[in-house]
Amino acid sequence: MFRTLLKSKIHRVAVTHCELHYEGSCAIDEDLLDAANIAENEQIHIWNINNGERFVTYAIKGERGSGMISVNGSAARRAAAGDLIIIAAFAQVHNDQVSAHEPQLVFVDDKNRQTELRHKVPTQRM
């Protein structure tokens, strides 16, 4: 049996551009793609913290070191420059490997530069 687990997350990254008439997808600074282990053309989920929108698209490379997060195509109607979003990718993990699985959790500063990399979501407490 396989389970779908969180593989990668870029947490609270700011949208820098929205390009309605671009071909589609989400352009992500290549440094962040590498840190999160997200491949070009990989399916990603985007959760907009500002407005609650949730949608699925795919990742393309943005200029390395630029901090670029460009929401493109029809998805551009679901975000605005300055919105904080979470970008996530999932993987099918065999049941035997679930306990050993560690996601890549990337945290950024206000310029979308990586500040921290974690491999575990902390337990939520009251």
Swiss-Prot record:
Reaction it catalyzes: L-aspartate + H(+) = beta-alanine + CO2
Where's it mainly located?
cytoplasm
Cofactor: record remark: Binds 1 pyruvoyl group covalently per subunit.
Q: Does the keyword Cytoplasm apply?
A: yes
Pfam families referenced in this protein's UniProt entry, alphabetically:
Asp_decarbox
Cofactors that this protein relies on: pyruvate
State the top-level EC class: lyase
Name where it's found. Answer: Cytoplasm
Give the E.C. number(s).
4.1.1.11
The superkingdom of the source organism is Bacteria
GO BP term (any one)? alanine biosynthetic process
Keyword S-adenosyl-L-methionine belongs to the record: no
Q: What does this protein do?
A: Catalyzes the pyruvoyl-dependent decarboxylation of aspartate to produce beta-alanine.
Which family, according to UniProt?
Belongs to the PanD family.
Write down the NCBIfam families for this protein, in alphabetical order: panD
Q: What is this protein called?
A: Aspartate 1-decarboxylase 2
Q: Which organism is it from?
A: Polaromonas sp. (strain JS666 / ATCC BAA-500)
